[in-house]
């Protein structure tokens, strides 16, 4: 299992109780460093924290790009969890929702993903310095349409905040 956008690893820990191994990824190196040190002190070997910036993950590195393969060539997870991450990639880094969902479709047969609604406080904060209309397609209806093109939704749940929905979906075909 991969936990993309793991932050402090709370959900990675929960997932590790139900999974053989969790790769916990985040684009914040300080968060990953803290998680690594905490897991090391606990002697927790079921979670591997990795610094990964999906918006600039690149290919392999080393001689001829082959010494260490890029993250997408290191294995395919049975399930990916992406909580509190897609709005950052869409709004901050301008990666369209469709492209993100294509990546997830190509990566994993099962997905747990959180979609913050347009009225979510963090979404509004991220949009503060963006010109009007640039992210009009960032909304729950469009996300569900795009998700349903690529995945079959097994379940969805509105979180208590009322501004985020979590989906569990399996890849079509």
Model-derived features: positions:
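Conserved class I S-adenosyl-L-methionine
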Residues: 1-7
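Conserved SAM-binding loop of SAM-dependent methyltransferases across substrates and taxa
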Residues: 8-20
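Conserved SAM-binding motif I beta-strand of class I
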Residues: 21-26
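S-adenosyl-L-methionine
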Residues: 36-74
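A conserved beta-strand element that flanks and buttresses the S-adenosyl-L-methionine
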Residues: 81
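A short, conserved alpha-helix within the catalytic core of class I
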Residues: 88-104
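Conserved beta-strand signature within the Rossmann-like core of class I S-adenosyl-L-methionine
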Residues: 103-117
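Short alpha-helix
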Residues: 134-150
């Amino acid at each position: 299992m991969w936990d993309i956008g793991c932050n402090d690893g709370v959900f990675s820990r929960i997932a590790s109780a139900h999974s053989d191994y969790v790769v916990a990824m985040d684009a914040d190196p300080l968060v990953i460093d803290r998680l690594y040190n905490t897991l090391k002190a606990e002697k927790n070997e079921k979670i591997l924290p990795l610094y990964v910036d999906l918006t600039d993950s690149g290919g392999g590195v080393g001689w001829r790009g082959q010494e260490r393969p890029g993250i997408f060539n290191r294995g395919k997870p049975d399930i990916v969890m992406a909580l509190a991450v897609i709005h950052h990639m869409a709004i901050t880094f301008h990666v369209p929702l469709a492209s993100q969902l294509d990546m997830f479709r190509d990566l994993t047969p099962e997905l747990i993903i959180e979609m913050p609604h347009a009225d979510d406080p963090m979404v509004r904060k991220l949009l503060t310095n963006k010109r009007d209309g640039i992210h009009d397609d960032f909304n729950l209806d469009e996300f569900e349409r795009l998700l349903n093109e690529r995945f079959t939704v097994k379940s969805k749940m509105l979180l208590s905040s009322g501004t985020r929905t979590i989906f569990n979906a399996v890849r079509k075909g």
